[in-house]
Amino acid sequence: MSNPQDQLSNDLANASISGDQSKQPQQQQPQQQQPYFNPNQAQAFVPTGGYQQFQPQQQQQYGGYQQNYTQYQAGGYQQNYNNRGGYQQNYNNRGGYQQNYNNRGGYQQQQQQQYQAYNPNQQYGGYQAYNPQQQQQQQTQSQGMSLADFQKQKAEQQASLNKPAVKKTLKLASSSGIKLANATKKVDTAKPAASKEASPAPKDEEASAEPEAKKESTPVPASSSPAPAAADSTPAPVKKESTPTPSVASKSAPVSASASVVTADALAKEQEDEVDEEVVKDMFGGKDHVSIIFMGHVDAGKSTMGGNILYLTGSVDKRTVEKYEREAKDAGRQGWYLSWVMDTNKEERNDGKTIEVGKAYFETDKRRYTILDAPGHKMYVSEMIGGASQADVGILVISARKGEYETGFEKGGQTREHALLAKTQGVNKIIVVVNKMDDPTVNWSKERYQECTTKLGVFLKGIGYNKDDIINMPVSGYTGAGLKDRVNPKDCPWYEGPSLLEYLDNMDTMNRKINGPFMMPVSGKMKDLGTVVEGKIESGHVKKGTNLILMPNKTPVEVLTIYNETEQEADTAFSGEQVRLKIKGVEEEDLQPGYVLTSPKNPVKTVTKFEAQIAIVELKSILSNGFSCVMHLHTAIEEVKFVELKHKLEKGTNRKSKKPPAFAKKGMKIIAILEVSEPVCAETYKDYPQLGRFTLRDQGTTIAIGKITKLL
């Protein structure tokens, strides 16, 4: 190597390979043994043109490979090359012909023109078209190339560089060789199997859709695994994280590349957004979430029962309850201390009346629960409706104490109205809890229990509850008998059924649309270093950073933080859960209860006019066209006007009358067109029951219930 010409050729070789010797040390050894090197060639070559990459000796080096490898043809190219990093794998993935030279000043085209038999732009089945003899002839010809020939070839190269290159995608087939396919602009070829940050999605769908994109199917040695190297050297504008299949494209075609990448990214995101229900179960230790609402007449014992359940399940510690007991005693409200767990504000504690819907959270061994404690007073029925719209199961608390049951159930009492409103708001399962059974006037009497449940059972069936969906049980909210543990057989030998929590833990679960389009009616709002909305997710799931639309204003918002039932931050929340979301993009004063957060792809519909089927349950006079009242639809409260009565429905058959009725009165079922003054978020009852049922109220009483049949 002391010869200066040898030194010069070595330097040039180093410059052309530019650091690839470290990756491929085996290339350098044949170089020193080459008998073909012609120093005159090296002197004739002018490096100042910036074409240091063109090295005839480089081809001789590859020629050396050919001669070596023709001896191995008996074992097949593929096996031999696969074991040694392979011609195609090695060069394609580790700075090979196409990618490496493409990045280094277009050496690729030169190689292509000289090796016409080996053309990566055509889809050959493996190596059949690769002819080493022809290759060697061409190499020997190319060594005697003059400078003029070289310049001519260079001009051709420039021209070919300006042509739009065909975008390539690597497909790893089940065989050990890798084929370069001409990728068309179909999404399938560029479709990523799943992004690196993909949430645990159901993988069988992806696998069946594109088996060739599975990396596992190719037994490639780790050192030459295709993805990382290609990601280093590919110049195309492809996002690394979302495309594990390396796509090879020349710089002249960034537009088509980015277009297909966008669709591929969208597909990846869609797959990422799918959530496996099994994974969700594992996440919460197999516990699903149930919202329960305590409802019933004022003083039936709803808050006391809720407070006692929280104490019995360990959600409220003993010290807190003892503190409430002392405070209640000082205030002369000794028997109310358990209700103070639920009724937190001063006014509620002084009057012993719940005013707003109290919320609390507890957990058993099998499930997670949110208690919604509805106010029993008729002044606060609208709050109760908002609470019922978020509940899965209704617990109707009735007092067995003499006089109290009658007050609650007879005219003017709230027991009937609450049961009706719960049914209208989609609470299809109702547990009738006969409370205060330990009272001296009752003393666990079976006769009194049956008297209470029989009357109420007839009424509940009349408003549409199935026999199987009505469950009765005797309890004492104050002593806790029948809440967590079963009632003591000494006190109550005639009841052998489950306790309240035992029944809740073992009842059938609701069908949740975890992968449906996201929908969450806003039930409350607040300002807490930003805008916070709360509500129950009716469909779909949400993650931090998700972009949503707030309807009906069509305001785009971003989810910054998710708070779950226990007020802790969470990364995701699923259908059926009660959550608070901190959102960006809207001011607190610009939204109100009844607005709906929805996914941008499937936004909830907004209407001012719709057709509905209405059953009139309580109406002192009659109603006709132009009648106005208040409508409660999910969490929205709007004034509504009857624009047109279209049909009367016959009792029993539900057949429509041909003539529109002139008026409607109590007990009638009608189809009418209603109009609201402001746009309201609604869906038909058939598509989304939660957003398609409503209650009509007038002068403090519920006059009708209805479901939307058509949006106009």
From Swiss-Prot:
tr-type G domain mapped to chain residues: 287-512
Gene Ontology molecular-function annotations: GTP binding; GTPase activity; translation release factor activity
Binding-site list for GTP: 296-303, 373-377, 435-438
GO CC annotations on file: cytoplasm
The UniProt record lists the keyword Lyase: no
Biological function: Involved in translation termination. Stimulates the activity of ERF1. Binds guanine nucleotides.
One Gene Ontology term from the biological process aspect of the record: nuclear-transcribed mRNA catabolic process, deadenylation-dependent decay
Alphabetical list of PROSITE patterns matching this protein: G_TR_1, G_TR_2
Key words, A-Z: Cytoplasm, GTP-binding, Nucleotide-binding, Phosphoprotein, Protein biosynthesis, Repeat
InterPro entries (UniProt xref): EFTu-like_2, G_TR_CS, GTP-eEF1A_C, P-loop_NTPase, Sup35, T_Tr_GTP-bd_dom, TRAFAC_GTPase_members, Transl_B-barrel_sf
Principal place of residence: cytoplasm
Name of the protein: Eukaryotic peptide chain release factor GTP-binding subunit
Biased segments, Low complexity type: 24-35, 48-64, 132-141, 190-201, 218-256
Region G5, annotated ranges: 476-478
CDD domains: EF1_alpha (cd01883), eRF3_C_III (cd03704), eRF3_II (cd04089)
Residue numbers spanned by region G1: 296-303
Annotated region (Charged), positions in chain: 144-282
Region listing for G3, in residue ranges: 373-376
UniProt record similarity statement: Belongs to the TRAFAC class translation factor GTPase superfamily. Classic translation factor GTPase family. ERF3 subfamily.
Ranges where the record places region Several sort of repeats: 16-143
Stretch list, region Disordered: 1-64, 76-115, 132-162, 184-256
Sequence ranges of Polar residues compositional bias: 1-23
High-level lineage: Eukaryota, Fungi, Dikarya, Ascomycota, Saccharomycotina
Residue segments, region G4: 435-438
